[in-house]
Amino acid sequence: MEINGVEIEDTYAEAFPIKIARVLITAATKRWAQVAATEATGFATSVIMCPAEAGIEKFASPSETPDGRPGVYVQICTFKYEALEEQLLERIGQCVLTAPTTAVFNGLPDAEKQFNIGFKLKFFGDGMESEAQVAGRKVYKVPIMEGDFVTEENIGAIAGIAGGNFFIFGDSQMSALTAAEAAVDAIEELEGTIAPFPGGIVASGSKSGANKYKFLKATANEKFCPSIKDKVENTEVPADVNAIYEIVINGLDEASIKAAMKAGIEAAVTVPGIKKISAGNYGGKLGKYQFKLHELF
């Protein structure tokens, strides 16, 4: 299969189950909502060594938020609900409560699983906190130096999916990077997914385990490393490819990840110098979900 003259390999992305909480952060301005969201989703690229995977899902206009202010939806992902609750408390408590003019609302109010994060955060008020209603939602008002920090009582979570992905093969580092940026821009327009790596892009895609250093959980995916393509048996790097970037996508459900992969690939192949699109899979060792590239189209 080809799209815009670029080969789409007949392969699949292998993904795995993960627990996902969705949080809406609002602020007086879009800038401060984004600052708080960026801080709250830091050090969260991969569960290989981070305590969570997290990222900005989408921006929300004032007409879409409970308090009528600009907002940002973020997703925070861990393997277990217990760890997810800890991450929510720490990230909201340290990165959102501390940020100017912010408020926190439940991004999954209909989810069966609910964490009473707001109830726990209210204790920062040391007895001076109060209950209120915002657009029919129960919130706590915590007095702080600038005024009141408003947080909804609960934050919802569901069983989602992590590790949807595709690889972008370019004839140069800049062509591949430009295509990866275009892919991330397209994905950011959609609802239900995040791309948790820096700027949404993975420069150092890994394989599960190691050939030599068995103490590592993940190591360089040497079959996709252009600088050593002449040294690696069964390299996956074509002769005319000199850089590869991976886009990793987490999402609330399979449909959201498929839509994000499709949009990202369609954007990437419009960039001159892109030679091929592939995906990462590990023979079923990583997860139970398979997103076949050809079936996206």
Curated annotation (Swiss-Prot):
<dbReference type="GO" id="GO:0005737">
    <property type="term" value="C:cytoplasm"/>
</dbReference>
<keyword id="KW-0012">Acyltransferase</keyword>
<dbReference type="GO" id="GO:0006730">
    <property type="term" value="P:one-carbon metabolic process"/>
</dbReference>
<comment type="subunit">
    <text>Homotetramer.</text>
</comment>
<dbReference type="InterPro" id="IPR014053">
    <property type="entry name" value="ForMFR_H4MPT_ForTrfase"/>
</dbReference>
<protein>
    <recommendedName>
        <fullName>Formylmethanofuran--tetrahydromethanopterin formyltransferase</fullName>
        <ecNumber>2.3.1.101</ecNumber>
    </recommendedName>
</protein>
<keyword id="KW-0963">Cytoplasm</keyword>
<keyword id="KW-0484">Methanogenesis</keyword>
<comment type="pathway">
    <text>One-carbon metabolism; methanogenesis from CO(2); 5,10-methenyl-5,6,7,8-tetrahydromethanopterin from CO(2): step 2/3.</text>
</comment>
<dbReference type="Pfam" id="PF02741">
    <property type="entry name" value="FTR_C"/>
</dbReference>
<dbReference type="GO" id="GO:0019386">
    <property type="term" value="P:methanogenesis, from carbon dioxide"/>
</dbReference>
<dbReference type="InterPro" id="IPR023447">
    <property type="entry name" value="ForMFR_H4MPT_ForTrfase_fd-like"/>
</dbReference>
<dbReference type="InterPro" id="IPR002770">
    <property type="entry name" value="ForMFR_H4MPT_ForTrfase_C"/>
</dbReference>
<dbReference type="InterPro" id="IPR022667">
    <property type="entry name" value="ForMFR_H4MPT_ForTrfase_N"/>
</dbReference>
<dbReference type="GO" id="GO:0030270">
    <property type="term" value="F:formylmethanofuran-tetrahydromethanopterin N-formyltransferase activity"/>
</dbReference>
<comment type="similarity">
    <text>Belongs to the FTR family.</text>
</comment>
<comment type="function">
    <text>Catalyzes the reversible transfer of a formyl group from formylmethanofuran (formyl-MFR) to tetrahydromethanopterin (H(4)MPT) to produce 5-formyl tetrahydromethanopterin (5-formyl-H(4)MPT) and methanofuran (MFR).</text>
</comment>
<dbReference type="Pfam" id="PF01913">
    <property type="entry name" value="FTR"/>
</dbReference>
<keyword id="KW-0554">One-carbon metabolism</keyword>
<keyword id="KW-0808">Transferase</keyword>
